[in-house]
Amino acid sequence: DNFDGVYTACAKTMTEVTFMRGSKYVFCETREAFQSARNYLENGNYVLYTGTPCEIAGLISYLGKNYEKLITCDFVCHGANSVAAYQSWLLEFTKGQTVKKLDFRDKSVFKWSTTATAYLENGNIIRENHENCYCCFDWTC
């Protein structure tokens, strides 16, 4: 609901997992996520923690011991913008309008495009195609 950054969330149902889908490209604010994961583990629950490789390393370091019921899943990190850079981009991209939904990679335009799409509260849609340096064939840049 709040587009000021990306935050770690806990889901107990598959419906709740749906809200976590999609590319983020911004450093994640873990807030109390590590502590929550530890609490769930200490209470004998399974925990699946998904994040960037550095977030997973941070969690394991924070926990300080192995937990049999901890499952971690990291993904290839293409680099993440700082929260300040993201907020600046979002303000410029939406011209300060209230965002209802944000897709960094809108697959409705082209299946794996680099089109960012903001669905605004007033019903308008803003799209912006941005460079994808990870699929660039210009090795001189």
Task: Tell where the protein language model's regions lie, with residue ranges.
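Iron-sulfur-associated redox domains of electron-transfer enzymes in respiratory
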Residues: 1-141
